[in-house]
Amino acid sequence: MSKGRFTPLASLRRLLLRILVVLAVFWGGGIALFSVVPVPFSAVMVERQISAWLQGDFGYVAHSDWAGMDAISPWMGLAVIAAEDQKFPEHWGFDVSAIEKALAHNERNENRIRGASTLSQQTAKNLFLWDGRSWLRKGLEAGLTVGLETVWSKKRILTVYLNIAEFGDGVFGVEAASQRYFNKPASRLSMSEAALLAAVLPNPLRFKANAPSGYVRSRQAWILRQMRQLGGESFMTRNHLY
């Protein structure tokens, strides 16, 4: 009798373990595969597409065109590093000082939460996980980030990030964004245009690259200053990112 009472719990544990094993194999395989193969779509793209269909919007298309780093202007990589993660070449996936500052800020300003995700974390989240905030998702994100940093080069992480980042409603990846907003390939983006695209990244569904608000213009100017302070294009070659 005693053994029977514990059977449902044991079965649940076995089921959860099997699910975790399947997910680990799936994500591990994805990390290995996408270290060399172009990424056709991300979890965020799938989530956006399904959400649109469920709302009856059958005209929505989550669009992305893969571009290798040699087909992307070096200004674009520099712009997202300047805007999102200036220690990207140095850290192993996590910026401890940025996390500490974000925690201190969030304790003082509970209504204005600040994140501290690195480009590596954002790539892991956008590629493999669902949108939202939870300790479970953050834990999975941390594990996937370690996987990316272990298997991929920094250049590969940046390349995938630029190809799956959301730049507007249905616009994913810098090639699609460059064509949509500037009618040119990503390889021809100027320093100013790259900074403008990077300026909308905190909230690409609210901020518009084709109709920039005063805040977006101000952020663009700040990013341009940071790009110059980092050393311009030489920063990319010096850190083997281009």
Swiss-Prot record:
GO cellular component terms, semicolon-separated: peptidoglycan-based cell wall; plasma membrane
Bilayer-spanning residue ranges: 19-39
Pathway: Cell wall biogenesis; peptidoglycan biosynthesis
InterPro entries per record: Glyco_trans_51, Lysozyme-like_dom_sf, PBP_transglycosylase, Pep_trsgly
Keywords associated with the record: Cell inner membrane, Cell membrane, Cell shape, Cell wall biogenesis/degradation, Glycosyltransferase, Membrane, Peptidoglycan synthesis, Transferase, Transmembrane, Transmembrane helix
Membrane topology: Single-pass membrane protein
Domain of life (superkingdom): Bacteria
EC number(s) per entry: 2.4.99.28
GO molecular function, one term: peptidoglycan glycosyltransferase activity
GO biological process, one term: regulation of cell shape
Localization per Swiss-Prot or TrEMBL: Cell inner membrane
SUPFAM superfamilies linked: Lysozyme-like
Main subcellular location of this protein, as a coarse class: membrane
Role description: Peptidoglycan polymerase that catalyzes glycan chain elongation from lipid-linked precursors.
Protein name, per record: Biosynthetic peptidoglycan transglycosylase
Organism: Citrobacter koseri (strain ATCC BAA-895 / CDC 4225-83 / SGSC4696)
